[in-house]
Structure formats: structure tokens, C-alpha cells
């Protein structure tokens, strides 16, 4: 039997996985069973590929996961702050 995870459980599980990689600058949004994980540019390279695999493996297949990497080496928090209007318009947060 597959256990259905609620938003809080999903967010907690992702934060736990990201914490293993000592990533401090990230953001998680869980909306209507969809997950948006904002990670720094450095996470595009290995060994962080394993993190992405772990995130996909830890969640139910019915949950859609999107991973966003802010460009130009900006911090995730800076990128979100600078682009908050556009991000809200696109309903990403």
C-alpha cells in the first residue's frame, strides 16, 4: 500500500534530503501535490545529481517535481526576491 504524503511531510522529506548535501541556499514550494525545488547553480553538477535522484525516489510517482536553478550564479534567495512578481504571476510560489 502506498502512503499518500501531505504537503508538510513532502516538504520535511525534501529538506531532510537536501540537508544531507549541506546545501544552505535553497527553497521548497509544495502546492496542490506539486513540488518546486529551487537549488543553487552548483547543484546542476555531480555529485548533486544523486540528490535529484533521491528526491524523485523519496516521493510518490503521482507528485510532479520541478527543479529550478537560478542563472548567473545568483543565490536562490536573491533570485526569488528580485523576481517575486514574475514568480507569483507564474504561480511558482
PLM region descriptions:
Residues 57-84:
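A short amphipathic beta-strand at an alpha->beta junction
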Residues 43-49, 74-77:
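Short, surface-exposed beta-strand/loop "edge" segments at domain boundaries and coil↔beta transitions
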Residues 38-42, 70-71:
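Structural motif
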Residues 1-9:
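N-terminal presequence-like segments and adjacent domain-start helices
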Residues 85-93:
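Short acidic DE-rich linear segments
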Residues 19-40:
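Short edge beta-strands and adjacent turn/loop segments
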Residues 10-18, 45-64:
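Short, non-transmembrane amphipathic alpha-helical segments
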